Amino acid sequence: MDVEQMKAFTDRCSQCAAVSWGLTDEGKYYCTSCHNVTDRSEEVVSTAVIPNTKINSISRGLRQRSKHEKGWDWYVCEGFQCILYHQAEALETLGVSPELKNEVLHSFWKRYLQKSKQAYCKNPVRTSGRKAKVLEDNLQSSDWGSDFELLSDTTCPPESGAEFQSDSQTPKPFPATKRSSKSASVCSGSVDGVEYSERKEKGLLKMTVPRTLALCYLSLLWQRETITLSDLLRFVEEDRIPYINAFKVFPEEMKVYGRDKGIFAVESWPDYEDIYKNMIEVAVFLDLPRFPDITEDCYLHPNTLCMKYLLEVNLPEEMYTLTCQVVKLTGIGEVDFLTFDPIAKMTRTVKHDVQAVAVIVLVLKLLFLLDDKLEWSYSDLAEAYNEGHKEETPQFDFRKWYQVMKKTFDEKRRKWEEARAKYVWKTKRPLYRSHIDKSVAYKRREMVENLQKQFSALIGSAPEVERQAPSSFQLNWTGEDTGSPCFHGHSLQGLLISKGQALITKNSLYWLSTHKFCKSYCKHVTTYEESNFSLSYQFILNIFSFLLRIKTSALHEEVSLLEKKLFEKKYNESKRSSRSKKVRRH
């Protein structure tokens, strides 16, 4: 290869902006940094085999690298479809029925594409006058093969004038066409990344990464699976479900840069309230019908969830009878109350896991009052009884339970905070503003990895912690190596008294978490300030809010709403008395 010929070509590489050229056997210039091959060529004469004969083919390896570097033409909706596919696959490995991916989630996603006019409609949204092949009514098979075959041809309510294929063959995803130099986007790796981020239409609900989780939870709710929203978010934290920087699951040929970063790069943990709000918005946008009924034999029924969380926080199983009574008295166990109906005139939404925990908190207040006085008095009586009746079933000792739970809770929270602090947000696949910055981004990433290796060598390699199998329970009290006492079999005998054939709580007092509910347009039900409540009440709220990954104020609000249902008469009397006081003042 003539060095002078390479020096004569001083153009910058269109992929990495470097000026470092070599000549292929075919005589074309290629970038030695990123292996991008240009159209400009130089006639090269090879005398290795036959004198004065020009080689007409490039080596197979270099051609594959060139194809790999250029990537595919892909659309934003394909990116979200890829994320949804991998999220559904992850849920299936966690024990969810395959029907969730193949039927329910597929139908919801197909419906979304139709409602947002991206596919399955007569006039899909076009991109810059370019023919959007991936959005044609008659979808063709693609180079992706079976990897992202999430979309199938199951029935979906069509728009007026829309036509669909009715064959029941294998699912057909959007085709991913090879990237051409003319259609390559300078500002984004995707074809429509810029236009998608700037698209603003009234009534349009743009897909986001948090809304992919909302779609997954809607599918779980439709299937009535044994995974609550708090469980789903916890599995995301444990990196069992793709969410943080979800573009990591994209094939290498799907280049992500520029505007794609704002669409697919998520560098924050999912928030319960945010995902729940997105779930409702997506369900309303899709115009989904009433969901399957949540009956008493379903996992999401408050009676079932109450038993689950009683075992989770090491409380006596006898409390289950009291939680069932509260569920019955408040009416939160009725089918119509629990079942999600997005198109109803009065859309009622239920946070099943938060509601069940609120029932347990209310029962604890009924038993112990939780005023930092009565619970300790009952603990003294239980301790004295247990010392004199060691062979009998022990009575529940609130003080002992508090000590065990505080130690376990503090240790669990410490490990959780350490895991969050050590979490690596940056991926091995760096993001960059444009293809011009690619080489710089990769060099920076390589430098960071080298520094990390050097620091690891200096401080010594920490032993790898074995990853535990996924479980619905975060705390285990029945295992052999727990090292903590289990209170599941303890009795509530000292806390209940018989009245006829019924048992009532020995404690006859109760304090309301909220005396007056806000009626302003801010829609805040109540406020929560720790200084206004007892330490034992704060401790219990902190435990449950940590297990559910929610704010303490959100759980306090749910407890207040439940109390309003249970003590409706008391609230009405308080309301009338406040009105009479206002009259007397005037």
Swiss-Prot record:
The modification N-acetylmethionine is found at M1. It comes from the Eukaryota. Residues 40-68 are annotated as: B-reader. Pfam families: Rrn7_cyclin_C, Rrn7_cyclin_N, Zn_ribbon_RRN7. Residues 260-370 are annotated as: C-terminal cyclin fold. Residues 158-171 have a biased composition (Polar residues). One of its GO terms (biological process) is RNA polymerase I preinitiation complex assembly. The modification N6-acetyllysine is found at K438. Signal peptide: none annotated. Residues 158-188 are annotated as: Disordered. Residues 69-73 are annotated as: B-linker. GO terms for cellular component: RNA polymerase I core factor complex; RNA polymerase transcription factor SL1 complex. Keywords: Acetylation, DNA-binding, Metal-binding, Nucleus, Transcription, Transcription regulation, Zinc, Zinc-finger. Interacts with FLNA (via N-terminus). Component of the transcription factor SL1/TIF-IB complex, composed of TBP and at least TAF1A, TAF1B, TAF1C and TAF1D. In the complex interacts directly with TBP, TAF1A and TAF1C. Interaction of the SL1/TIF-IB subunits with TBP excludes interaction of TBP with the transcription factor IID (TFIID) subunits. Interacts with TBP and RRN3. Part of Pol I pre-initiation complex (PIC), in which Pol I core assembles with RRN3 and promoter-bound UTBF and SL1/TIF-IB complex. Component of RNA polymerase I core factor complex that acts as a GTF2B/TFIIB-like factor and plays a key role in multiple steps during transcription initiation such as pre-initiation complex (PIC) assembly and postpolymerase recruitment events in polymerase I (Pol I) transcription. Binds rDNA promoters and plays a role in Pol I recruitment as a component of the SL1/TIF-IB complex and, possibly, directly through its interaction with RRN3. Although it shares weak sequence similarity with GTF2B/TFIIB, displays a similar subdomain organization as GTF2B/TFIIB, with a N-terminal zinc finger, a connecting region (composed of B-reader and B-linker regions), followed by 2 cyclin folds. The RRN7-type zinc finger plays an essential postrecruitment role in Pol I transcription at a step preceding synthesis of the first 40 nucleotides. Belongs to the RRN7/TAF1B family. This is TATA box-binding protein-associated factor RNA polymerase I subunit B. It comes from Rattus norvegicus (Rat). The gene is Taf1b.
